[in-house]
């Protein structure tokens, strides 16, 4: 493609958002810190909608946030179904393609199915932890 906006552009990394996702995000109660962390994660998204997690201290140094704030923001992003732990990769988060996606748009359904599987496992584990805590009290 040649034209005004394509001259000399090489290997641009990008992600897209959906209008549905943007509308849902506007209705959340995410904090400024949550959004800051989200955009940090999006700046590191790969074509599979994954983000390899650096340790919280390094992330904190990059975006000027404490480890505690990062942990809270990750919990908030999970609670709002924006991210989930990738069940196939260690130290990796998966971004919900309903909100943001990278790579081929033709794989959105496949990515959404995988996110749903990851998120279900997160909910199942959360439920087990709640049940275990009730049983120990």
Predicted regions mapped to residue ranges:
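N-terminal intrinsically disordered, low-complexity, charged/polar
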Residues: 1-11, 126-137
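Intrinsic disorder/low-complexity detector
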Residues: 15, 36, 57, 98, ...
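Short alpha-helical interface patches
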Residues: 19-26, 82, 100-104
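Short secondary-structure transition/capping segments
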Residues: 41, 85, 132-134
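Short, amphipathic alpha-helical interaction segments positioned at domain boundaries
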Residues: 100-130
